[in-house]
A protein has these predicted regions:
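Ribonuclease/tRNase effector modules and their secretory precursors
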Residues: 1-86
Length: 86
């Protein structure tokens, strides 16, 4: 896959114990994406161990985005992940 945008990570995204590398992995290689607001996206993916991770990405424009929330996916999102894979 090719990505032509830049994705950064805000320090606040790491407060739930997800590493920066795993937050970026889940946000870049997401399985499900949903628009939360005009400039915010919920992205559901997996960390390097295969655990489901939820991220919120702020779209800044000009191809730039920032992950500002990352945590182990809550149960309410699990169905979205597994429904998408089948």
């Amino acid at each position: 896959m090719y990505y032509d945008n830049e994705l950064g990570i805000h320090a606040s995204a790491l407060k739930h114990g997800v590493s920066a590398a795993d937050a970026l992995l889940a946000a870049i290689q997401y399985i499900v994406i949903a628009e939360l607001a005009e400039d915010r996206e919920l992205r559901l993916g997996f960390d390097s161990s295969g655990k489901p991770i939820e991220t919120v990405v702020i779209v800044l424009g000009s191809g730039r985005s920032v992950v500002n929330h990352a945590m182990p996916a809550r149960r309410k999102f699990w169905a979205l992940l597994y429904r998408r894979q089948t």
